[in-house]
Amino acid sequence: MSKNISTTPPVSCTLCPRRCGADRSAGQTGFCGAGGTLKAARAALHFWEEPCISGTRGSGTVFFSGCTLKCCFCQNYPISAEGLGKEITVEHLAEIFLGLQEQGAHNINLVTPGQWRPWIIAALDIARAEGLRLPIVCNTGGYETVESVEAWRGSIDIWLADLKYVSSSLSAELSSAPDYFAQARPAIEAMMAQAGHPVFDSEGILQKGVILRHLALPGHIDDSFAVLDQMAAWNEADPGCFIPSVMSQYTPFYKAAEHGIGRRITTYEYRRVVNYAMDLGLTAGYMQQKSSAREEYTPSFDLTGI
């Protein structure tokens, strides 16, 4: 169903918690790096998400340019921080969605879409009118407003969200977002209220619900414990309201070494995080293997599919 969403670039952008006020209609770029024309860097089947997302045929993943966070360790930094990507129309994005469906994708996976929300919703409306029937995944770093989550209502089926930090000093240092947890906590609660408990199809592929990810960082497992405490509190209040996913794949990309995290997490550190999660009862989800910290799992941003 069309929402009659305008794709006119915002005059004073408030799409993310930064509310930077960039006049994107005049060609200014926001804090996120996004301007007035939709931009993406890759669209292809992706096989390295959680099994209930990637399945056997892959997740139809579209990587959008720009990001509302500035994570110093971002594995996607060429597109999130350096502006790599190609400008496209809303109509072409709709064609990309339909093409991924034709390739057999289990879902359409929107990676860091928040800065392009009005454009993407319009493209989804066009694609659905032309036969798109797959679940739509919002793959987000968790730095959202409740208003943004609500604006996606009717367009998103699955929230694949990070809960990166609790510590405001750590989120300021590593992602330039001292208010990360203050924004992410209510936003994630809104995601869970909107999507409801997880629903799977006969193949075990998620059709609706929330997957809540946490990437354990070297030297900062105390903050991981705080994140897991918050996850456990949600699970205790409403058992099964999300699928936990604890990840070990941290690799020191981009400017990580400048911020004291220029190494991979040790087996000892990660085992402590996993044990803590299990002790809290966060067992009905995913615990990534330590061997997943490999650079080859990062896709090539070569404009494939764009």
Stretch-by-stretch model annotation:
Residues 1-29, 197-306:
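Auxiliary Fe-S-binding modules of radical SAM enzymes
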Residues 1-68, 72, 76-81, 301-303:
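N-terminal [4Fe-4S]-dependent radical SAM core
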Residues 40-61, 95-113, 285-287:
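Short Fe-S-cluster ligation motifs
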Residues 72-76, 82-87, 120-123, 148-149:
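Short, conserved acidic/polar surface loops in the N-terminal third of protein domains
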Residues 78-107, 276:
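Conserved alpha-helical substructure of the radical SAM core
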Residues 86-90, 177, 181, 263-267:
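Flexible, glycine- and charge-enriched loops at secondary-structure boundaries
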Residues 89, 115-116, 292-293:
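Positions that flank functional sites
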Residues 95-259:
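Conserved AdoMet/S-adenosylmethionine-binding subsite of the radical SAM
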